[in-house]
């Protein structure tokens, strides 16, 4: 592929929380913005303000005080196609400033995505945006590429969904994939709830964004939850303060680690599921006995919800406790893991061997949207 931006492939990782988009071959996404579509709650009264009927991404975020914010992607799966189209339109025309009809486009999807969902994505890309070629790749597999491996088990935890995906020699093993509908957004909700216990009230969609910021800046994973709780109760050494947009300062203590602890103990938010360490172990146990050793030695973390300080050590401790005692266990936590899905997509789309994998407009016209199941696995 040429080096100029004229025919370069585009890579768009549509997460539940953030859209990461850019050009194949780059080492980081050029555009990262929230997957939000906002609509005004009030009637416009000033003439000539050029008010729009909807706002996308950062613009929606900055005007959140007067908007109702909606996320079109829930639990990694697109639920609102009209809003999703707005997000893609915004990605191509406003963020990347490209004409989609000139660029092959690589999209990502959650593992175990419904079939109808992939078809609809394919259809919108070819019929609404007229892309010349496209491909849909599984997010966790791309994260593994980004870490330079072809075998390993990926814990991909984003804003909407968490997966354990074992990959062997580049193939995801679908029977062993574990999906957990517990991720960053649920942790934000839980933090909103436990802050209410302290007497701080966060209710609106705009206030939720403030809590998300508190979570990202102050939360961490405790190595030993009970010990940490005791420390928090007996001293104020773990307390941190945070200034709200209106200048009010709030203090948070054990909430800092109680919030992400939910990943290991989903019962905190009333979920019956096993924690992320157990789902990782269960996923490995569903794989062939001969490849387990390779999976234990290559636990790759990916996604924004794995960015908490202390999470790798805690995973190491928990999986070591579950695994056979002689097993070598390694948790790989790349520093750029927030964007590793996108980076993997960028690597994949710029490989010369990948160029015959694209679904072309011609193939789509001949076979229709179902072509995606034949060409993208």
Curated annotation (Swiss-Prot):
Annotated SUPFAM superfamilies: Actin-like ATPase domain
Domain of life: Eukaryota
Signal peptide residues on this chain, from the entry's feature table: none
Coiled coil regions, renumbered to chain: none
GO molecular function, one term: hydrolase activity
N6-methyllysine carried by residues: 86
In-chain residues carrying the UniProt-annotated modification N-acetylcysteine: 2
InterPro entries (alphabetical): Actin, Actin/actin-like_CS, Actin_CS, ATPase_NBD
Record field: catalytic activity: ATP + H2O = ADP + phosphate + H(+)
Other facts noted in the record for this chain: In vertebrates 3 main groups of actin isoforms, alpha, beta and gamma have been identified. The alpha actins are found in muscle tissues and are a major constituent of the contractile apparatus. The beta and gamma actins coexist in most cell types as components of the cytoskeleton and as mediators of internal cell motility.
Function: Actins are highly conserved proteins that are involved in various types of cell motility and are ubiquitously expressed in all eukaryotic cells.
Family the entry assigns: Belongs to the actin family.
UniProt xrefs under PANTHER family: ACTIN (PTHR11937)
Stated name of the protein: Actin, alpha skeletal muscle A
Species in which this protein is naturally found: Takifugu rubripes
């Amino acid at each position: 592929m040429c080096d100029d931006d004229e025919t370069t492939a585009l890579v768009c990782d549509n997460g539940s929380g953030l859209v990461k988009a850019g050009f194949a071959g780059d080492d980081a996404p050029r555009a990262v913005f929230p997957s939000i579509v906002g609509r005004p709650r009030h009637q416009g009264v000033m003439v000539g303000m050029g008010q729009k009927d909807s706002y996308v991404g950062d613009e929606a975020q900055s005007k959140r005080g007067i908007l109702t914010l909606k996320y079109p992607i829930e639990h990694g799966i697109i639920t609102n196609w009209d809003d999703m189209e707005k997000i893609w339109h915004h990605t191509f025309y406003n963020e990347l400033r490209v004409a989609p009809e000139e660029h092959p486009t690589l999209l990502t999807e959650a593992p175990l995505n419904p079939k109808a969902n992939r078809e609809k994505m394919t259809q919108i890309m070819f019929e609404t945006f007229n892309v010349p070629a496209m491909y849909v790749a599984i997010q966790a597999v791309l994260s593994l590429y980004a870490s330079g491996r072809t075998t390993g088990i990926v814990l991909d935890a984003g804003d909407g969904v968490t997966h354990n995906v074992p990959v062997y020699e580049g193939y995801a093993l679908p029977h062993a994939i574990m999906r957990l509908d517990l991720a960053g957004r649920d942790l934000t909700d839980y933090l909103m709830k436990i802050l209410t216990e302290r007497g701080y009230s966060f209710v609106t969609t705009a206030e939720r964004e403030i809590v998300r910021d508190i979570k990202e800046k102050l939360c961490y994973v405790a190595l030993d939850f009970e010990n940490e709780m005791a420390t928090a109760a007996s001293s104020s050494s773990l307390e941190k303060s945070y200034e709200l947009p209106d200048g009010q300062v709030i203090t948070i203590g054990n909430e800092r680690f109680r919030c992400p602890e939910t990943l290991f103990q989903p019962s905190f938010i009333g979920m019956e599921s096993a924690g992320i360490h157990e789902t990782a172990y269960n996923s490995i146990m569903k794989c062939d006995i001969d490849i387990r050793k390779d999976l234990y030695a290559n636990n790759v973390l990916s996604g924004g919800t794995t960015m908490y300080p202390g999470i790798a050590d805690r995973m190491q401790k928990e999986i070591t406790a579950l695994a056979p005692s002689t097993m070598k266990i390694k948790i790989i936590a790349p520093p750029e893991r927030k964007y590793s899905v996108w980076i993997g997509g960028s690597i994949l789309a710029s490989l010369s061997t990948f160029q015959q994998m694209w679904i072309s407009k011609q193939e789509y016209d001949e076979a229709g949207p179902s072509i995606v199941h034949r060409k993208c696995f």
